[in-house]
Amino acid sequence: MSFPADSVGLVTPQKFQFEEPLHLECGRVLPRFELMVETYGTLNADKSNAILICHALSGHHHAAGYHHEDDKKAGWWDSCIGPGKAIDTNKFFVVALNNIGGCSGSTGPTSPNPENDNRPYGPDFPLVTVRDWVKTQAMLSDRLGISVWYAVVGGSLGGMQALQWSVDYPDRLQKCVVIASAPKLSAQNIAFNEVARQSILSDPDFHHGRYLENDSYPKRGLILARMVGHITYLSEEAMKQKFGRDLKSGKFMYGFDVEFQVESYLRYQGEQFSRNFDADTYLIMTKALDYFDPSREYGHSLTEAMSKTKCQFLIVSFTTDWRFAPSRSQEIVDALITNHKPVSYLDIDAEQGHDSFLFPIPLYVKTLRAFLGGEEHLKSTSLEAS
């Protein structure tokens, strides 16, 4: 198979092992952990061109390129990462990882628990937070010899990680890109997550999270959780244009099988997701979303939290995103402006809803490319740093 000219091509994931104990916010300790990582591009001599990509709820380390010659689907953000793309691998060294608690190779619920005869952690895996993830990402940075990231970039839950980076490690990133995100979840968003969790927890095949030990899997619950979540990722206009009230067979069947095209689509999305994602991981990821609030230890003042930051910011929202509405991005912008921090903000007119951040929308791509800059900007930044 020949890959597109602007693709990073074949990539091989790398597993990094960390033998030191990881103390988590929940009070528990992982005795050791592993991170699955992919890199694209070349790290320059002074290591000033590194960009960290933080993934969203269902994301992972495979952000660009292909794993096999016969792969039909590229990485989840291949539209923006590659030679000549917005995140240009001809200029930048790009690092993407699967967070702990995930199910794509990093230590998570399906990993062997050394404290339980190496049986899968399952529900015994500790709840983790965005701050925990950022802590492990900083440890990965040290392992790679990257003292300062040129940029930390993320969409949705990934944007929350980028924001946490700017607060917890203000001297370790020059630029922060927060896309389709929020400074914390609203009550409505927490409610959506709870409905998704309950669909899994109430599945008879869940077995209190020990489904692997019982040779079972809560497929129905995971399908329903994904269906609920997926609705919130799409805008009403996108669903109207894509499906409308189109019938699968062209006529009413007067039954409870699939009749409308949108029903067929949701069931398909749920089915595909259930084959590739772990139920315990889904529970962990949604709780990390719920817990995120960098203002909590600053008297619940986002303005105070943002006063700690030192980097340049790009905040991007999308007009039809009702999961993380533009007003949530504006909260971040307002807190930065109050602190006289350098911030650029763009609310992009896009019909794809929350999922817009995954699409190569021209203005979005142009803005991202312009903010990150190119080789000349890297040279000037390096001179300033020296």
Curated annotation (Swiss-Prot):
Classification via InterPro entries: AB_hydrolase_1, AB_hydrolase_fold, HAT_MetX-like
Keyword Methyltransferase: no
GO cellular component: cytoplasm
AB hydrolase-1 domain boundaries: 49-358
Subcellular location: Cytoplasm
Site (Important for acyl-CoA specificity): residue numbering on this chain: R323
Domain of life: Bacteria
Catalytic residues identified in the record: S156, D321, H354
Keyword field: Acyltransferase, Amino-acid biosynthesis, Cytoplasm, Methionine biosynthesis, Transferase
Reactions catalysed: L-homoserine + succinyl-CoA = O-succinyl-L-homoserine + CoA
UniProt-annotated binding residues for substrate: R226, D355
Assembly description: Homodimer.
Role of this protein: Transfers a succinyl group from succinyl-CoA to L-homoserine, forming succinyl-L-homoserine.
Protein name per its UniProtKB record: Homoserine O-succinyltransferase
Originating gene: metXS
